[in-house]
Amino acid sequence: MLEVVTSPSLATSSDWSEHGAAVGTLSDREGIAKSAALSVPQLFVKSHPRVPPGQSSTAMAAYGQTQYSTGIQQAPPYTAYPTPAQAYGIPPYSIKTEDSLNHSPSQSGFLSYGPSFSTAPAGQSPYTYPVHSTAGLYQGANGLTNTAGFGSVHQDYPSYPSFSQNQYPQYFSPSYNPPYVPASSLCSSPLSTSTYVLQEAPHNVPSQSSESLAGDYNTHNGPSTPAKEGDTERPHRASDGKLRGRSKRNSDPSPAGDNEIERVFVWDLDETIIIFHSLLTGTFASRYGKDTTTSVRIGLMMEEMIFNLADTHLFFNDLEDCDQIHVDDVSSDDNGQDLSTYNFSTDGFHSTAPGASLCLGTGVHGGVDWMRKLAFRYRRVKEMYNTYRNNVGGLIGAPKRETWLQLRAELEALTDLWLTHSLKALNLINSRPNCVNVLVTTTQLIPALAKVLLYGLGSVFPIENIYSATKTGKESCFERIMQRFGRKAVYIVIGDGVEEEQGAKKHNMPFWRISCHADLEALRHALELEYL
């Protein structure tokens, strides 16, 4: 007769559940399958028919007592291990969520180590890891905790020693600045408001090379937008956006057009970017406490160089009475003739138009041949400007170049680096891909081009972006500029006079007044912060 004996491992005592959990954990953590196999209870035990039941009682303990195999000892009471104060030395990566906010401002870098690896207790220590959800980045803790302490008897592998930081070389040099602000540097107190004081710049000007000062302020050497570089003559449309006659000269098309410009900065020239007229009158010297005699002397020397350049290289004697608003206004009358061997002094331009009465207010003349000769001159002016816009010294020659460099240095010292501050703002705008500088001045077009070249502004003002408001006024020039770049662009007017302010107000353009050095510094600061 078979005798069914209930194994002691099925006792109702809680020791079995605890012991099974410990063994299961050991099997998962240490990979000891043998110990787990030994703990499987034998539900049915078949007694040998020849062995009396009394003999088996000597091998079995009394009912209700806990029985363990020889390979597994009773687990000691559970030991609660505190979470280490220092987690592993891999900080949570900054995960950019859909709300475009960095939820880990305390990250010190992409790769960093803690001071050392904390010594882990027996078993697996808890570790933290970032959990990404729709609400952001959270710091969660893994649920792996030590369930029981195991001695060396239960481990197939020896314990691992702790590692120090000194074994590993740094990925970055000590001078590496992390891209994020560490948590220790974050200020817990409210931020205080700082007052910025504009310090007066030194009056000395560093020595420049013989080829500098013409374009050394230009910090942008990359390709420019067509409104900056390649907005030349177009076969069907003039630069002001109005339909004109088809020109026979075809320039290479630019990859982008004027309608792609997003922001247009319309500048005044005198007393805004440069100091010129107030030097001649002594107004600048009296306002800033400078020597009036020196101011007038520098102003007269600069005026002489401006008109000398305009007469010698830019046909000002021929074009003074036939002034244009824009250099391309008469390009439709140009037949594209090669001018490399053309003799401007003997083409009969003066004999055809001996008096100013033959040149109307808009530069239009009744004769087609005379208009073609006029267009030839403006085309040569454009070629000269584009060739020497960054090398004025090569245009005026070596003897005059030294005088020009010395005059520029004296001018900067007298005006407290006014032009240097202006060029900082101009170069910031010029470096943007979809922004452009446009110049509108009350000076005649040819002298205005000479001013731009001699003051070293050719790198930030292409000749296509220079307008003369001598005859029509600045408001009319603003309208032409808006027709050229479109209504979608944002226009910002920068100047010092009432005329540009009223024109900007009429066309709902923001106006930035320049009256002192602080205004130029504030403009540059606003551009750096991309407020403009």
From Swiss-Prot:
Its main location: cytoplasm. It comes from the Eukaryota. Extensively expressed in cranial placodes, branchial arches, CNS and developing eye and nose. Low expression in lung with little or no expression in skin, liver, intestine and kidney. Predominantly expressed in the upper one-third of the oxyntic mucosa and in most regions of the pyloric mucosa. GO terms for biological process: DNA repair; extrinsic apoptotic signaling pathway in absence of ligand; mitochondrial outer membrane permeabilization; striated muscle tissue development. Disulfide bonds: none annotated. Residues 202-258 are annotated as: Disordered. Mg(2+) binds at residues 268, 270, 496. The active site is at 268 (nucleophile), 270 (proton donor). Signal peptide: none annotated. Pfam families: Hydrolase. Gene3D superfamilies: 3.40.50.12350. Its EC number is 3.1.3.48. It is found in: Cytoplasm; Nucleus. It catalyses: O-phospho-L-tyrosyl-[protein] + H2O = L-tyrosyl-[protein] + phosphate. Functions both as protein phosphatase and as transcriptional coactivator for SIX1, and probably also for SIX2, SIX4 and SIX5. Tyrosine phosphatase that dephosphorylates 'Tyr-142' of histone H2AX (H2AXY142ph) and promotes efficient DNA repair via the recruitment of DNA repair complexes containing MDC1. 'Tyr-142' phosphorylation of histone H2AX plays a central role in DNA repair and acts as a mark that distinguishes between apoptotic and repair responses to genotoxic stress. Its function as histone phosphatase may contribute to its function in transcription regulation during organogenesis. This is Protein phosphatase EYA2.
